[in-house]
């Protein structure tokens, strides 16, 4: 979840988000080491009186600064590609949800059910109840079963949108005339908030997303009540 004055990421709620956090820490450490080395060399240049203006070539140094960056790039690229392919994998989803972006709300269709569709609008600030979050609450939450593979099909009816839920590591563009897909798995129940992450007009800031992840038996009761 998110906290007031938070500087880091939200708590990971899916295996993909956990992998992304590990990759972030891995890459950040590499960047920190490189930056420290560069600052150390600059400080030496500014403080020492030794110069090498007569040096015409240094094969050993040139070899090192050619090979070392290549190794560093490989250390960054390999885990990045691994996560990229993991995010594209969709193996036997238990449930498929079709999401359509509109100006300025979302509509959802549970394609495994005969007639389970609804629109999801932001609740105005004047209608919020105590404890509800401003600009993040909706009238119809997307209820999903936890610990199950869920496929999201995402498109748009009008302009470009982007369906994003940070704590699940999800961000997929909603493009008119094109159907994108992503997968999500939640490791624990709860409410997870997101927003449209592509500027789509004057009310772009008023397109929140709320996922309610519940145990399977509660999801079955909810789906039965909606039909």
From Swiss-Prot:
Lineage of the species this protein comes from: Eukaryota, Metazoa, Chordata, Craniata, Vertebrata
Family: Belongs to the cytochrome c oxidase subunit 2 family.
Binding site for Mg(2+): 198
Species for this entry: Rhinoceros unicornis (Greater Indian rhinoceros)
Gene Ontology cellular-component terms listed: mitochondrial inner membrane; respiratory chain complex IV
Localization (cell): Mitochondrion inner membrane
Cofactor(s) listed in the protein's UniProt record: Cu cation
Ribosomal protein keyword on record: no
Official protein name in the record: Cytochrome c oxidase subunit 2
Enzyme class: translocase
């Amino acid at each position: 979840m998110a906290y007031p004055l938070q500087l880091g990421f939200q708590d990971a709620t899916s295996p993909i988000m956990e992998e992304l956090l590990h990759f972030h820490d891995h890459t950040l450490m590499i960047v920190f080491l490189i930056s420290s080395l560069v600052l150390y060399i600059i400080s030496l240049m500014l403080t020492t009186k030794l110069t090498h203006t007569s040096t015409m070539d240094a094969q050993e140094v040139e070899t090192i600064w050619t090979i070392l960056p290549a190794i560093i790039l490989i250390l960054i690229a390999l885990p990045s590609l691994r996560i990229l392919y993991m995010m594209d994998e969709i193996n036997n989803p238990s449930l498929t949800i079709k999401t359509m972006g509109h100006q300025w709300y979302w509509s959802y269709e549970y394609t495994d059910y005969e007639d389970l569709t609804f629109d999801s609008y932001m609740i105005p600030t004047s209608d919020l109840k105590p404890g509800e979050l401003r600009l993040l609450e909706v009238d119809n939450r997307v209820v999903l079963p936890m610990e199950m593979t869920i496929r999201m099909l995402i498109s748009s009816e009008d302009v470009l949108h982007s369906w994003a839920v940070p704590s699940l590591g999800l961000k997929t563009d909603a493009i008119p005339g094109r159907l994108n897909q992503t997968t999500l798995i939640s490791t624990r129940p709860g409410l997870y908030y997101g927003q449209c992450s592509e500027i789509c007009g004057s009310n772009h800031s008023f397109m929140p997303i709320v996922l309610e992840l519940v145990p399977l038996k509660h999801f079955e009761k909810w789906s039965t009540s909606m039909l």
